[in-house]
């Protein structure tokens, strides 16, 4: 939605300029393209020349589809622009969940210089010394981060992270097959048997448990064993209804109409609405998770100063806007927010009002080791419940098939014997 608005505005500006010219023939195709294209201006170009010619490279580990790649005409390729400006090569790879990121770093099998985990995972990594303090002298563009995103609970002294995006979780659905009025849609639709095998569910424990906890009236940060078990039972109850537990696949399946209903992050939902006009997105009134993803440097990083330069680059106003315009998530960056059109700034999905945030949202905190362990065990139990269901049905079906085969053989022999007699 935002990308389409941006391009339309650029096109209108180009047309207006063309109409104002007495001789439109002097406008070349290159000039028209320049009018439509996003441009990059940095505040201190000399700052970015410190490592030129040194052959440095940084390893960046980020969520999929979470940076402007220049794939859309007229948009910036953020990593390519950084490489061109600094001479530092960016090795860029993706992960699908916070848990995947954590496992990769904890296992020590790879070295990364920049990561972008979510709030609760940042808190966990700080506790386990997996991320290191930042030198904010190397990140002057931190000045653009809005005050209400500084010193968050997951990084109280703001030593380890720079906010990148934020958003809420809601429900995306196909309006051509879901016949429930939008204002009545809530999390219980993910348990609605009318949509058997057409529902997708998150394939990570924290997000999935959160939805069950909201339905049961619990805090998203509960550590009570009875409540965690009740949430797990709720997810097990859902197993026979859902088509599958997925993450990135939600985008393709919903866009193609291969599923009808799924929980989804608001930014990704706004992007997918561009591809399928039948889809709708709603943030349930019963409550939701508000998440913040922030940029950190792991303790294993080999190029800390170059990584801080990359973080500062992501906070350049033109870059911050290009990213937000492309991925459609909400921004904590004051200059990027001012560059958005008024419609987007007032969009209740992208920027819900303060009352909704205060009363209907909850930010994840890092749970205790004991609670994390119990949730993971319950999650594993829930996931294995699918196999148990298969086994429970497989045995009777196999038995019936076996009996039928035996009866068939006996009938065949009986008929054959009768033929032999006559």
Could you tell me what each predicted segment is?
Residues 35-124:
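Early extracytoplasmic/lumenal segment of secretory-pathway proteins
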Residues 17-20:
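C-terminal motif of bacterial Sec signal peptides marking the signal peptidase cleavage site
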């Amino acid at each position: 939605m935002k990308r389409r608005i941006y391009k339309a505005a650029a096109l209108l500006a180009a047309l207006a300029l063309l109409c104002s010219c007495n001789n439109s023939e002097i406008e070349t195709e290159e000039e028209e393209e320049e009018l439509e294209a996003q441009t990059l201006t940095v505040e201190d170009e000399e700052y970015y020349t410190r490592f030129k010619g040194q052959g440095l490279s940084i390893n960046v580990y980020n969520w999929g589809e979470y940076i402007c790649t220049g794939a859309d005409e007229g948009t910036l390729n953020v990593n390519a622009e950084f490489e061109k400006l600094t001479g530092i090569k960016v090795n860029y790879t993706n992960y699908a969940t916070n848990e995947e990121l954590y496992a990769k770093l904890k296992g020590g099998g790879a070295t990364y210089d920049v990561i972008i985990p979510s709030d609760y995972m940042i808190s966990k990594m700080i506790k386990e010394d997996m991320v290191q303090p930042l030198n904010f002298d190397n990140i002057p563009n931190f000045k653009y981060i809005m005050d209400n995103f500084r010193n968050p609970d997951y990084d109280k002294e703001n030593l380890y992270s720079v906010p990148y995006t934020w958003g809420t979780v809601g429900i995306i659905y196909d309006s051509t097959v879901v016949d429930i009025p939008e204002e009545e849609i809530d999390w219980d639709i993910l348990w609605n048997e009318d949509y058997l095998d057409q529902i997708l569910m998150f394939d990570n424990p924290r997000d999935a448990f959160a939805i069950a906890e909201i339905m049961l009236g619990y805090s998203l940060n509960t550590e009570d064993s009875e409540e965690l078990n009740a949430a797990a039972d709720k997810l097990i109850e859902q197993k026979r209804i859902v088509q599958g537990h997925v993450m990135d696949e939600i985008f393709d399946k919903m866009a193609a109409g291969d599923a009808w209903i799924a929980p989804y992050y608001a930014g990704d939902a706004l992007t997918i609405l561009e591809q399928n006009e039948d889809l709708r997105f709603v943030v349930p009134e019963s409550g939701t998770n508000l998440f913040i993803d922030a940029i950190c440097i792991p303790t294993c990083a080999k190029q800390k100063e170059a990584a801080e330069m990359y973080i500062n680059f992501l906070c350049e106003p033109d870059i911050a806007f290009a990213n937000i315009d492309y991925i459609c998530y909400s921004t904590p960056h004051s200059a990027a927010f001012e560059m958005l059109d008024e419609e987007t700034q007032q969009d209740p999905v992208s920027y819900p009002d303060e009352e909704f945030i205060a009363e209907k949202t909850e930010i994840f905190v890092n749970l205790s080791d004991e609670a994390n362990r119990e949730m993971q065990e319950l999650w594993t139990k829930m996931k294995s419940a699918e196999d148990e269901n298969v086994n429970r049905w497989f045995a009777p079906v196999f038995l019936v098939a076996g009996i039928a085969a035996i009866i068939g053989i006996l009938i065949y022999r009986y008929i054959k014997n009768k033929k032999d007699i006559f």
